[in-house]
A protein has these predicted regions:
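Conserved, mostly hydrophobic/aromatic
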Residues: 43, 55, 79, 94, ...
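Distinct, well-ordered alpha-helical segments
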Residues: 68, 91-99, 119-130, 150-159, ...
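Beta/alpha (TIM)-barrel catalytic core signal, keyed to glycine-rich beta->alpha loops juxtaposed to Asp/Glu
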Residues: 7, 146-250
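N-terminal secretory signal peptides and thylakoid transit peptides that target proteins
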Residues: 1-17
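Active-site groove signature of glycoside hydrolases
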Residues: 133-149
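C-terminal segment of N-terminal export signals and the immediately downstream linker at the start
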Residues: 23-53
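Alpha-helix-loop-beta-strand connector modules within alpha/beta enzyme cores
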Residues: 95-108, 163, 167, 236
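Acidic-and-aromatic substrate-binding clefts and catalytic sites of carbohydrate-active enzymes
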Residues: 60-63, 82-91, 114-120, 147-153, ...
Length: 250
């Protein structure tokens, strides 16, 4: 009887281990699925179906191609860069990492066009980014960190965009911003049909009631209670909206 009990005990123990192992494997699988992109959404009038989480590259440094590959493997297909990020190294890393996979992603770059910037300067900036990115076009090219309507009103930017689109170097354009005059700049860009896509800072702090809880000054990103209105206007005009600083980070 004791031998039978021992066999039953061992059998039950083995079965329990198998069940426990299967449960852990199931949990690991669920965790892995949870670390992947959950859905893709249309980016406004561009028609691009982009991942619900994008890859920002402002701190991407040489030798970090593996981070780009990790993002690709998890379903991210929207990669955001700029000519100023890590002195151009960020775009170089993106270009290296996306070699052979360019047609699987949407690639974004940005440059700063000022009120007095000439088209020739913008052409040079775009071409330099294309070389670093190892591609002949970008899907989205943005006027970077705009906080002055005069930067958007510069006719050289509009002419540059028109010519670059015609040449197939840019598919969509717009602006990015996160400073004090963001709403005025967005209003101007949308009202004058200067943006297919906008990249804006947006987070829980946009709710004015949130700030009423505090007596000190807070994050410069969010003191713009009119931002929800202008983002709704963007939606009505089919302008794609991408958000950044969603956790109020830098």
């Amino acid at each position: 009887a004791s031998g039978m009990d021992r066999r039953r005990f061992l059998k039950a123990g083995t079965l329990g281990a198998l069940v426990s192992g299967a449960a852990r494997a199931s949990d690991a699988g669920a965790a892995d699925r949870g670390n992947r992109v959950q859905r893709y959404r249309r980016l406004g009038r561009t028609g691009f179906e982009v991942s619900d989480i994008s890859f920002g590259s402002s701190r991407l440094r040489r030798g970090e191609e593996h981070l780009v590959h990790m993002a690709l493997d998890r379903g991210i297909n929207y990669f955001d860069g700029a000519d100023s990020y890590t002195g151009g190294a960020s775009e170089t890393v993106l270009g290296n990492a996306l070699k052979g996979r360019r047609d699987q992603v949407y690639l974004v770059s940005k440059t700063k066009s000022w009120a007095g910037t000439r088209r020739s300067e913008l052409d040079a900036a775009l071409n330099a980014s294309l070389r670093r990115l190892r591609t002949d076009y970008v899907d989205v090219y943005l006027n970077h960190a705009v906080n002055d309507v005069e930067r958007l009103a510069n006719p050289e930017w509009g002419e540059f965009v028109e010519r670059a689109k015609a040449a197939g170097k840019i598919r969509a354009t717009g602006m990015s911003g996160h400073a004090g005059h963001l709403v005025a700049c967005l209003d101007h860009a949308i009202d004058h049909d200067l943006a297919d896509v906008v990249l804006v800072a947006y987070n829980f702090g946009q709710d004015p009631a949130f700030y009423e809880q505090f007596t000190r000054g807070f994050d410069y990103v969010a003191k713009q209670p009119d931002l929800p209105r202008v983002l709704e206007k963007a939606r009505q005009n089919d302008v794609g909206v991408v958000t950044m600083k969603t956790l109020m980070g830098a």
